[in-house]
Amino acid sequence: MNKRKLNYTKLWKILKSRGLTRYYLVNNALGYTMSTATLAKLGKGQSVTTETLLDICNLLDVDLDEIVETEVIVTDE
């Protein structure tokens, strides 16, 4: 059975296209703050809360499908 994992490549592309760094998610002018631990999870493609993803969407004024997608991991099972 194949598994899926989250991929945040779209998020990183949006930040880059806007001239922003990943640390904009930690410290920004809008007052939204994210822990560096959560930023590390995003960087590793790990799960974060839905609330965190929605906060990022609100911060960047995008929809969820614009920042995250799933990718299939093929297993031998």
Could you say what each language-model-derived stretch is?
Residues 1-23:
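A short, Lys/Arg-rich alpha-helix, primarily the initiator
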Residues 16, 27, 58:
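Alpha-helical residues within the helix-turn-helix
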Residues 23-29:
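Short alpha-helical "recognition helix" segments of helix-turn-helix
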Residues 26, 39-40, 54, 68:
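Key DNA-contacting residues within the recognition helix of helix-turn-helix
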Residues 31-47:
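Recognition helix of helix-turn-helix/homeodomain-like DNA-binding domains
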Residues 45-58, 76:
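Short, basic-rich loop-to-helix N-cap that marks the start of a DNA-contacting helix
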